[in-house]
Amino acid sequence: MATTLSTTRQPQSPAEFFAKKNLLQMGLGILGGGFTIAQWLIKQHPKSITITDSKNSDDFQPAIKKLTTLAQNNKVKIKFVLGKHRQQDILTNDLIIVNQAIPLDIPLLKLAREKKKPIENDITLFYKFVKNPTLGITGTRGKTTTTIWLHHLLKSQFPKSIFGGNIPHKPAISLLNKIPPKNPIVLEIPSFQLELLKDKSPRIAVI
């Protein structure tokens, strides 16, 4: 008998959820995850996206050029603020997406909560829209190795299964709609990303 993992039907598509929203992405980063998330967000056609980072580095310029072109092609307004995160960006945007390197207890995010601004991260957005069953791996050490090996084992039963999460260039949100709904996704999820995950969780969790 074939193995099955149950799924949960989601009420909205990403495009419906992000329509007419002004987005703030805090943290572009240089490891590729922030860039991939920004690409995905732009393709959902929000009204606008502001991307901020506390660093002001020439290393960002290739990513900025590519994201600017992508935004123009998708008719999305885009703005970059480098060297700081600003209060005005918290106040003027509808939804805040935080990079995993951003501590959740910084004053700007405290302000966001006071102003009732929704705060999301890669994992929480992923669980708003995922139609596949998921297996989550968290813990102190060995998460990536465990994630890759579990995916390797699952491929014997689910050849189209994929893995990602806290892995460079493979953020969870970029995995949406990549494989048929009944095929599982194996995720590496750091504990600090789980802090924002409220009423959703992996179908199977490993610590």
List where the protein language model places each region.
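Phosphate-binding loop of NTP-binding sites
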Residues: Q88-L91, Q100-I207
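N-terminal leader/targeting and accessory segments in enzymes
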Residues: M1-N121
